[in-house]
Amino acid sequence: MTVTDDYLANNVDYASGFKGPLPMPPSKHIAIVACMDARLDVYRMLGIKEGEAHVIRNAGCVVTDDVIRSLAISQRLLGTREIILLHHTDCGMLTFTDDDFKRAIQDETGIRPTWSPESYPDAVEDVRQSLRRIEVNPFVTKHTSLRGFVFDVATGKLNEVTP
């Protein structure tokens, strides 16, 4: 059996008690951008219930064009008005450089990626960079609150980053 098979079995239990359908717009009108790290249980750490928030995840909580696309849809079509960014301590993005990563892929495949992994040496500074990317973006302008945090994987606490 695979892990996917285990998860499918879990879904049977989940579906048996499912209370749907929920409205499409998130009830708390908030979008959260977070790192994909498996140690971050965004729903539990913030006490989010189903249907309350959009949660957008990628490697490093990097504000990429695709994150901007998702935030623009979240705001303009589904009414979100707050944005939270969630980086964390001990992030894998702190452990390599873009050039080394791209070179390793090229050595293995013969093709150098055209995209950037956007690694960074400092999570706090990257939160600031991410906040600035959103602040200056002409497509993501409908928010009344934009805040960034670093989650401490050792303590479970969120530390707010000042811009």
Swiss-Prot record:
Sorted UniProt keywords: Acetylation, Lyase, Metal-binding, Zinc
Cited InterPro entries: Carbonic_anhydrase, Carbonic_anhydrase_sf
GO molecular function, one term: carbonate dehydratase activity
Reaction equation(s) it catalyzes: hydrogencarbonate + H(+) = CO2 + H2O
Cofactor: Zn(2+)
Enzyme Commission no: 4.2.1.1
Keyword Membrane appears in the UniProt entry: no
Enzyme class: lyase
Activity regulation remarks: Inhibited by sulfonamides and sulfamates. The best inhibitors are 3-bromosulfanilamide and indisulam.
Family matches, as SUPFAM superfamilies: beta-carbonic anhydrase, cab
Superkingdom of source: Bacteria
GO CC terms, sorted: plasma membrane
UniProt miscellaneous comment: Was identified as a high-confidence drug target.
Task of the protein: Catalyzes the reversible hydration of carbon dioxide to form bicarbonate.
Subunit structure as annotated in this protein's UniProt entry: Homotetramer.
Entry's family note: Belongs to the beta-class carbonic anhydrase family.
Name under which the protein is recorded: Beta-carbonic anhydrase 1
Species: Mycobacterium tuberculosis (strain ATCC 25618 / H37Rv)
Phylogenetic placement of the source organism: Bacteria, Bacillati, Actinomycetota, Actinomycetes, Mycobacteriales
Gene for this chain: mtcA1
